[in-house]
Each structure stands twice: as C-alpha cells, then as structure tokens.
C-alpha cells in the first residue's frame, strides 16, 4: 500500500477501497453492516457536530465504550478535527474514570450506555474541563446529548469533500491519542501517541505478514487497548471489513462471521485449548483414542515442518472440525499482551491455525517484534519489525528505539525521563534474551523479579505458566520478595475440578469443602511437586494455598487484557500470604 502520512489517510484509503468494505455490528447475535460510504458519512457528520461544540485541534475527547462500529466512528471523527481521543475501559470504576478525565483534560466524553453515563455524571463535577457529555445508546437526560442528535446529516458527496478538506490540516506529529496504561503496578499514566507512531507501526507490522486484503476481521479485544487499536488500523489500511463483538460473545461471533483474521491475548487461546481437551476427556474411548493420535501427529508436523498423509487424514477427521469452531477461514491469528505458552502455540500450529506471537507495549504503539508467517519460532516473540531497533541492557532489560516510541507520558516529564533517554532508547521494563539470528524471548517483568532473603533472583512468570498448564489450575501467582522461600496462590479451575472430583466420588457442592478435601489437596500438591522438579532449589515453591474464587477484571485482580495485577493480589491476600511464613508447612484453602 502507499504509505499514509496520518490516520486520516488510512481512513481515506479504506472508505474509497474497491470492493467496498464495511463495519459489522456483530454484538449479541446481530449482523448489521455499515458500508464504507455510510460510515464515512457518519464520521463527517459527527466531526461537524463536535466542531460546532468547539472541539478542535489539540483538544481531547474521551470514549468509554465496548467494541462496536460507533467506537471507530467517534475515533475518526475526533482525529479529523486534529483532536486526540482518550479511550476509557468500560470496566473501570467511577474513581478510575475520574482520574483519567481529570488528568487528560477531556472537553467531551462519549459514553456507550446508561451504565457508563452514570459513571461520567457521578464524577463530572470534579472534572472541570468536561463541557459536553454524549450518549450512544438510550435516552439522554437533561444536559446530555445523544450521538445520533449530534451527528449532522450530510450527503455522501459532502462527507467526502469535508473529510478530504480535513486531511491537510492534521500533521504526522499531531497527538492522536492518550492511552492510560492499565498497569499491573503503580499509577496509570497517559501515554502520548502521535499519528506517526500509529502509522509507522501499522505499516511496518503489515509489511512482514501476509495480511488478507478485502476480507473480514473480527475485533473482540477492547479497542481501549493499544493492541486491538493498532491492529484495527491495519485492517482499515488493508481494506478489510471489520466486525465487532464483546469478548464474552466471541465463540458465537466466530461461527457466524467466520473471520479470516483476529487478534487475541494468550488467555483466549489457552481457554480454547482447555475446552477442547476437557470435552475430549469425557468423550467415548474410541473418540479419545483418535484424538490422542491426531494430537501426536499434529505436534510431530510442527517439529518436522512437514504434513504427510497421516496429517491429511486427521485433518479430515479432527483438525478441520476444531478450525470450524473458530470460523473455519483463519489463515493465521495474532497473540500479544502476555507470553503464549509454547504447548498451546504448538497445538494450534499443528492443527492448521498458526498463532503468531508478537511483543510490544502501549508506549511503543505497540509492536516491537512479531513472528513471521514463513519462519515462526515458538517460544519467542519473533523478530523486530522494519525500522525498529532492539538491544539488551547489561541487566537484561529490553531497550528499543524508533518511530514507534511514544512522545512521552502526559504531564509527567520525570516519569518520561525515567524510561526514555536522550538517545531515544526506551526502557521496556521487560527482561529478555536476543538470539544470534534476531529472535527475542521475554523471560519476565523487571519489577516482578523476586529477590529472596538469601539474595537469589527468581523470575516468577515462567513458573506460573508451568503451573497453569494443568487443567486443574485457572491461575497462579508466586510471591517471596525478601522472604526466605517462594510461596504460591493457586486459583482452582472449578470447571475441570468438579468433574474430576465427581469421577472419584468426592462431594462438590461446597467449594471450601472441596478444596480442603485431602484427595484434592494431594492432586494440587502433585502439580506443584512436578513443577518443582525442574527448578533450582531456591526457585521451588515451598508452600501454596488454593483459592476458590477466580481473579477478574471486576474485582480488580486482572487488567482489561487479563494480566494479573500482582500487587493487588498481594494486598488482597496479605493475611493468607503471611500465614505461609508464620506457620509450619500446612495446607489451607481460601475458598
């Protein structure tokens, strides 16, 4: 594609693409298509409506909404005015919304529905910059405008002329967005990303993979997150139709929309993997036997790089049916936001769905590296994309430099200076290794490294990942910083634990009683012991506690991209953790 200069150029290419693409509202069983000319008309009409309210170059407009066509309509309307948008996760609490609106100085706020509107109205009094509140769905109370009423009626020709007139007024170095990091630690900071940040990263990432053109992609990761945001701009640049649904509706939408491409976090692939193996575990013996053999052949094909007659046979019997569950038309998919377990990547690759793992951060727009379609190396996050530099610091931290690196943190010059040096090198906070042929492997977060009382450094993420490979484990978090030994909180996967227990005649109605059952305790001890066998003595888990309540975004233990907020978990379960250092090695559940 001809390299665009700004995101307005990206949208211009999409709205004039042939054959004409569309936006698809695939939420809650819908399949409502908005052709590109109609989408452009709505963008122009909304931009004119916002301009009439005084929104202009340099202003900020907040969006608090789930994934839907209106998200991008608001996004592109704001960008055409030379303003920047401020995405807000719909899962945030009112105090968190207040902090973002106040810090960003947003002049207008777009709220998806009455629930999100209630948060905005609750905090509006302490956000003096907010002049206008706009509601997408529902009846607007006094003092609130609806998106439909604000969007001016314009013809297709007038819309095209208006959008074209906007393009020269927006420059590549203009601010495009303030994205507040969800943060597994510390206070969220507003990351300043320009049009050039996004355009460079989109063009560079698109250049190294065979992106399908004029086909359909599905967005279900939050568009408030930089990964789905950046990938969506690649979809627009490639002239794709873009469907939207909520993350809890993904299974249904995949079957209905049958996308050629989507992006997900590793937990999505892990859940699909776990569900497949759980369903097969209860299947008739013959079916289980066929599946086990099919998995063996699939994994062998990954290691050998060849697909012979056996693979083709099992493709008919097994693999094609699994692919059908995700639409049946995927050529590849993308994983980012956290490490993808190698065994999960190998399984999907083996059955014909190549999951390409990449790496980046909000501060890097986000893509730094990605595995290539023709030379993936599972267990790594791939090679740098063109124009991006990476090096490893003396302490193992990954540093990067290039046009993908943010302008800085909004109103936080010292925080910016702490991570971005005078030569343009950005300190990612991740510990990694770079192979001789340029493949990057991330081993842990620098801030997550546990230093025991004996001075030994323990990288917890790899150990936690090994614990999560058990179908009985939903999640696991290690602790032990400045302590004599390592301990773990293990979240039981009740979906798989209950059938496991019933098969052994154990009562399952009471969760606490189930987790305290000696047979259950022994099963989890076996999982921990098995992981410990491959660890150095100082890394081994000496004690653990079982938790019966899964971590969630709503309760604050997970970020919107399902990463564990280690400090939140530590604070919430501080008494449980303390007990593992003050008692003899005994077991206790925390259901």
Each predicted region: which residue ranges?
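Conserved pre-ATP/AMP-binding loop-to-beta segment of ANL
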Residues: 19-21, 135, 156-180, 187, ...
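ANL superfamily adenylate-forming
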Residues: 28, 115-172, 276-321
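Conserved AMP-binding A3 loop
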Residues: 33-37, 176-202
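Structural core segment of the AMP-binding/adenylate-forming
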Residues: 53, 80-153, 523, 529
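Conserved ATP-binding/catalytic segment of the ANL
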Residues: 53, 64, 181, 384-452, ...
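Conserved AMP-binding/adenylation subdomain of ANL enzymes
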Residues: 199-216, 223-319, 329, 354
């Amino acid at each position: 594609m001809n390299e665009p200069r700004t995101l307005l150029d990206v949208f211009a290419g999409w709205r004039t693409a042939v054959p004409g693409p569309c936006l698809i509202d695939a939420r809650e069983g819908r399949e409502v298509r908005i052709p590109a000319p109609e989408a452009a008309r709505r963008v122009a009409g909304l931009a004119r409506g916002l301009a009439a309210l005084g929104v202009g170059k340099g202003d900020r407009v907040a969006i608090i909404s789930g994934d839907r066509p209106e998200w991008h309509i608001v996004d592109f309307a704001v960008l055409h005015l030379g303003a920047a948008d401020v995405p807000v996760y719909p899962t945030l609490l009112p105090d968190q919304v207040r902090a973002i609106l106040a810090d960003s100085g947003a002049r207008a706020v777009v709220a998806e529905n009455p629930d999100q509107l209630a948060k905005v109205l609750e905090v509006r009094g302490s956000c003096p910059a907010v002049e206008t509140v706009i509601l997408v769905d529902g009846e607007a109370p006094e003092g609130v405008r609806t998106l439909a009423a604000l969007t001016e009626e314009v013809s297709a020709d007038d819309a095209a002329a208006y959008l074209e007139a906007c393009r020269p007024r927006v420059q590549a170095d203009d601010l495009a967005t303030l994205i507040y990091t969800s943060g597994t630690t510390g206070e969220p900071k507003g990351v300043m990303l320009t049009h050039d940040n996004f355009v460079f990263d989109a063009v560079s990432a698109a250049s190294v993979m065979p992106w399908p053109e004029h086909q359909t992609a599905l967005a279900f990761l939050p568009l408030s997150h930089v990964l789905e945001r950046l990938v969506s701009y690649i979809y627009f640049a490639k002239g794709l139709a873009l469907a939207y649904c909520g993350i809890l509706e993904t299974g249904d939408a995949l079957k209905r929309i049958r996308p050629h491409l989507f992006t997900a976090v590793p937990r999505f692939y892990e859940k699909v993997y776990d569900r497949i193996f759980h369903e097969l575990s209860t299947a008739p013996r013959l079916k289980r036997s066929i599946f086990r053999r099919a998995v063996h052949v699939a994994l062998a094909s990954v290691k050998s790089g060849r697909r012979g007659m056996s693979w083709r046979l099992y493709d008919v019997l097994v693999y094609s049916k699994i692919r059908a569950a995700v639409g049946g038309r995927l050529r590849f998919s993308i994983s980012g936001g956290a490490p993808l377990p190698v065994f999960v990547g190998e399984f999907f690759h083996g059955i014909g769905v190549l999951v390409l793992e990449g790496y980046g951060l909000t501060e890097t727009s986000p893509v730094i590296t990605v595995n290539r379609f023709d030379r993936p190396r599972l267990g790594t996050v791939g090679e740098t994309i063109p124009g991006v530099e990476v090096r490893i610091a003396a302490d193992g931290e990954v540093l990067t430099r290039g046009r993908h690196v943010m302008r800085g943190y909004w109103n936080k010059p010292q925080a910016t200076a702490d991570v971005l040096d005078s030569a343009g090198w950005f300190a990612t906070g991740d510990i990694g290794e770079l192979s001789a042929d340029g493949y990057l492997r991330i081993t842990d977060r620098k801030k997550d490294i546990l230093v025991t009382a004996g001075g030994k450094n323990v990288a917890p993420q790899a150990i936690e990942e090994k614990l999560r490979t058990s179908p009985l484990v939903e999640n696991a978090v290690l602790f032990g910083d400045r302590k004599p030994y390592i301990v773990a909180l293990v979240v039981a996967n009740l979906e798989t634990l209950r059938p496991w227990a019933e098969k052994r005649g154990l009562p399952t109605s009471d969760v606490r009683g189930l987790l305290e059952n000696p047979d259950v305790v022994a099963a989890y001890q076996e999982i921990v012991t098995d992981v410990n066998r491959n660890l150095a003595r100082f890394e081994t888990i000496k004690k653990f506690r079982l938790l019966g309540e899964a971590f969630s975004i709503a309760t604050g233990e997970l970020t919107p991209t399902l990463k564990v907020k280690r400090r939140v978990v530590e604070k919430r379960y501080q008494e449980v953790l303390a007990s593992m250092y003050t008692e003899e090695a005994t077991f206790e559940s925390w259901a």
